[in-house]
Amino acid sequence: MNQASLSVDAITNLIEAFHHHHPAVRSAAVDELIKLGSITVNLLIAAYDDSQDQGFQAQIIQVLAQIGDAKALKLLAEVVGTSVANHCQGNVRRIAARGLGKIASTTSNTEIINNAQEKLIWALLTPEDWGLRYAAAVSLQEIATPKAKAALQQAIAQETDPVVRSRMAIALS
């Protein structure tokens, strides 16, 4: 067995551990996949696409958001824009928004920055989910482009939630 197939097998086994009944096993798998970093991204995206299990998908989004690899940009942006049927999905959207911030704040690629920023601005100005608006504000603060700051200034004027408005003020200070 060569090193590449060993790595694929190891990554696949870690991803499959998300189905384990014991939370410590799932947590350890998340930690290991994050440590492995970018080499896991394509397999994580494929596993996400192949599954209908929202809990499994949520674990994948958590890992992808923490890795912050641009290959996950499209998936994270899709998750941010997904309509929410329950509270757990809302949490996943917030994690995805933070992942977009990490990706955009750690690259110099203007196309990647603009794509992430556009989805985050939408998340800041559109959703009824205050937690998603909060996560978008934090991520736009990380990106810190003139467009991100302008969006925060626009949003703070219309924000009705005091916690989100406070976070926007911090982001603008």
Curated annotation (Swiss-Prot):
GO molecular function, one term: oxidoreductase activity
One Pfam family linked to the record: HEAT_2
Domain of life: Bacteria
Keywords associated with the record: Antenna complex, Lyase, Phycobilisome
Record field: transmembrane: none
Leader peptide range in chain numbering: none
The keyword Lyase is annotated on this UniProt entry: yes
SMART domains recorded: EZ_HEAT
Gene Ontology, cellular component aspect: phycobilisome
Keyword Lyase carried by entry: yes
InterPro entries: ARM-like (IPR011989), ARM-type_fold (IPR016024), PBS_lyase_HEAT (IPR004155)
Family listed: Belongs to the CpcE/RpcE/PecE family.
Biological role stated in the UniProt entry: An enzyme involved in the biosynthesis of bilin.
Name of the protein: Bilin biosynthesis protein PecF
Native organism: Nostoc sp. (strain PCC 7120 / SAG 25.82 / UTEX 2576)
